[in-house]
Design a protein with these regions (language model features):
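Preferential activation on post-signal-peptide N-terminal prodomains/segments
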Residues: 22-265
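Short, flexible beta-strand-to-coil junctions
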Residues: 249-251, 281, 350-355
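C-terminal motif of bacterial Sec signal peptides marking the signal peptidase cleavage site
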Residues: 17-21
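Conserved histidines in hydrophobic membrane contexts and catalytic metal-binding motifs
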Residues: 185, 277, 347-351, 367
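Low-complexity, Gly/Ser/Thr/Pro-rich intrinsically disordered linker/tail segments
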Residues: 339-359
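Bacterial N-terminal signal peptides that target proteins for export
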Residues: 1-9
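Charged, low-complexity helical/coil segments in non-catalytic cytosolic or luminal regions
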Residues: 265-346
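A short, surface-exposed interaction/processing loop segment used at functional sites
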Residues: 138-169, 173, 270-303, 360-371
């Protein structure tokens, strides 16, 4: 598995929060109309031009520290956005029972905790070995089969164990099509009254047996306990194919950050938002739902800075870093990034440096790096 990203993150501690970037760059854009430009004349006019003609890919090597070979996943026609108060989920136990009703007959009991809070305890009539936990703001379902899949697959780039790129997304398994697996996941969220927060397209990965075995062999080398765990589940013969479906959450078409993130300067860890499902021939093996949703609007609509401004700001963050080669950006998107109280829009840049990938976020209003 990959080494820790900690050395990369520590670099950012020495960087001050940076204001809007530097000079003009000529950028090669795919699927960008000939009269559109990322070079601002007036900030508002450029913003409208850019956001209405957002490219699907950027290929640019003219920056000082950054090289862009990046897919761009940003909605068109977004010129203004709000800051929202940050709310936790509120998953009602009755809704959980309804969501599982096509698959399991559940019962629940709400119990109090020593600190004055409460949590919901569920149990199934026909599967008393399944683990179901809900604190209203977080929900987990896991049966006995799920543990190996969960340990052998990781889509969260906030962790060094990320390996989702090793799994294909375009293969149907014999027992269920990809579309049917996605529908199962979305129907579950509909029953929890989360339909309006689902961001499309959802992510789907096919956990083929061959790739799972490859990941298992690598994991056993790195973690000898994995072999003991494998034996407790019945050995390699018990490894079976499944789908992993991830459903991001969104606010008015802009996804909420779905990877784990830590504010280095304030030591504030922030969980990703969304719903994860592992679906095998026997049905749901694993479900985890958590993160944040919008509350009330915290600020009125504000102008979003242009993509070029955000790219310049990103390049500027590396001025104090000694680089042996340019940092490569492979994906650009727009996210709502949570802090302690709010959800703030930011450009997310997926960077690759020395074989490691991580997200860097630039505030979509100020052009400052979120660290």
């Amino acid at each position: 598995m990959k080494n820790s990203l900690t050395p990369l993150i520590i670099i950012f501690i020495v960087l001050c929060t940076l204001c809007l970037g530097c000079g003009d760059k000529n950028i090669e854009l795919e699927e960008l109309s000939s009269d559109a430009s990322l070079n601002p004349v007036s900030s508002h006019d450029a913003l409208v031009s850019v956001m209405q003609s957002m490219p699907s890919h950027i290929l640019e090597s003219g920056f000082e520290n950054i090289r862009f070979d990046a897919d761009v996943v940003i909605p068109d026609n977004l010129t203004q956005l709000n800051i929202w108060n940050r709310n936790l989920l509120d998953i009602k136990p009755g809704s959980v029972v309804a969501a599982f009703s096509p698959h399991l007959n559940l019962n629940f009991e709400t119990r109090s905790t020593n600190d004055g809070g409460y949590f919901d305890m569920f149990w199934a009539d026909n599967d008393n070995k399944a683990i179901i936990r809900s604190w209203r703001w977080s929900f987990v379902f896991e049966n006995e089969q799920a543990e190996l899949h969960r340990l052998l697959f990781n889509r969260d780039r906030g962790y060094s164990q990320y390996n989702a790129d090793s799994f294909l997304a375009d293969i149907d398994l014999p027992f269920l099509s990809r579309e049917e697996a996605q529908d199962m996941a979305k129907e579950f969220l509909y029953a929890l009254d989360l339909r309006s927060y689902i961001f499309e397209p959802v992510e789907l990965y096919t956990l083929s047996k061959s790739q799972l075995m490859e990941e298992l062999d690598e994991e056993i080398v790195d973690n000898p306990y994995m072999e003991t765990l494998l034996k407790s589940h019945g050995g390699k013969e018990t490894i079976h194919e499944a789908y992993f479906v991830f459903v991001p959450f969104q606010i008015n078409g802009v996804p909420i950050m779905s990877d784990t993130f830590s504010y280095v300067t304030a030591d504030i860890p922030v969980r990703g938002s969304g719903a994860s499902f592992i679906i095998s021939e026997s049905g749901f093996e694993y479900i985890e739902i958590g993160g944040y949703l919008p509350g009330d609007v915290q600020s009125p609509l504000q102008d979003v800075i242009s993509l070029e401004t955000a790219m310049n700001a990103l390049d500027k963050t590396y001025d104090l870093v000694l680089l042996s080669e340019p940092v490569v950006v492979t994906k650009i998107t727009l996210y709502y990034v949570p802090n302690a109280t709010a959800l703030t829009p930011a450009y997310g840049f997926l960077i690759n440096q020395n074989g490691f990938s991580m997200w860097v976020y630039i505030n979509a209003f100020t052009g400052e790096q979120i660290i």
